[in-house]
Amino acid sequence: MAWRANLACLIKAGGRTRWFPLPEYLSMSPVLHNTCSRRKSTAPEKLAASVAACDTNGKEPGTALGRLYSPEQQASILHVLNTASDKELEAFRLLRGRKSVNIVEHRKKFGPFQSLESLIGVPLIQYKTAVEVCNSILCPENRRRKKSQEKWVLRKFIKPGVEKERLKAVNSIVSIVFGTRRIAWAHLDRKPTVLDWQQAECWKLTNKTYPSSFYLEEISSVVSKIPKADLYILEKSGLSIQNTSLFPILLHFLITEAMLYALLNKTFAKDGQHRVLSINRNAVGKHFDLMIGDTRTSGRELVKQFLSESVLKEQPRVFFPRELAVQYRQKIVKSSHRIEELYDSLLQAVAFYELVFGSGSELKC
């Protein structure tokens, strides 16, 4: 739990000064931020007069607890305290064991809780515990777990780490996938609508060693054709360095990735903000159920399905401009060779949006 020292209560009682930190929750009433905030110069007499003293058991006066929550939040908390059984109360971590039984017994003996302050009268529950109990009722553990799992998914599969708020603020992205012969990209807005989708032939990887200047010239030429976007998403290959036979291909991928990071991150030196991110290739494969063991299968049929749905469905998973949907489909059908980079660039863009905004299929980790 996060604590903020500037939200502390200093209370003068019986010649002793006591400090009570208050937890900060976004869902709480704004009143929380003003609770007990006093200037250091406030006279002790006035401070003591304005806030009641704590008793010897460390229990805070009831009125302080009520000021932390809005009337709606108090009503929600009281509803749980007055209607839940002891087993249901145990779902909240701090009420496991004897505390949940004490709440039910207190309710039977004295009637329903009329205010949050009366919670402090329950045995084993003091002010600090009461605050944590109220917070856990407002923000159940499963909701916190879902949020932390969501952050874990983004941290694990999208690198470098970027705040989710910033990811959600993007208006468009360019998804880039490169192979041994070509670089493909898909430009999508957040609807998501395909704004641009194409590829460029760059090289045919052979045993020949290419100088760095060759990579710079080839990739710079491609970058000049790529549309501007808020973020650029690159595919992170799953090739292992342990497989020595694939080392030339892995080296080629790493050089290409480094070049794209440098050429597309044009403002990084000024603001330190990453505009180029990498997403794990197999994570996208799992998102669309394209994995067979550790091997990712072709996304060709899935892309054809997206194209068909964009014409037939009112709310397709991906939107294509009508004049381009037929053109793209014909290109895929007529292609004599597999253009996997083109398929993968689109799937990667869709997976990115669905992971960030939580729509579509859930990632199977």
From Swiss-Prot:
GO CC terms of this entry: mitochondrial matrix; mitochondrial nucleoid; ribonucleoprotein complex
Entry's localization field: Mitochondrion matrix; Mitochondrion matrix, Mitochondrion nucleoid
Main localisation: mitochondrion
Tagged with keyword RNA-binding: no
UniProt cross-references to InterPro entries, sorted A to Z: RNaseH_sf, RuvA_2-like, TEFM
Any one Gene Ontology molecular-function term assigned to this protein's record: nucleic acid binding
GO biological process: mitochondrial transcription; positive regulation of mitochondrial transcription; regulation of oxidative phosphorylation; transcription elongation by mitochondrial RNA polymerase
Domain of life according to the entry: Eukaryota
Transit peptide: 1-40
Functional description taken from the UniProt entry: Transcription elongation factor which increases mitochondrial RNA polymerase processivity. Regulates transcription of the mitochondrial genome, including genes important for the oxidative phosphorylation machinery.
Similarity section: Belongs to the TEFM family.
Protein name stated in the entry: Transcription elongation factor, mitochondrial
UniProt organism field: Rattus norvegicus
Gene name per UniProt: Tefm
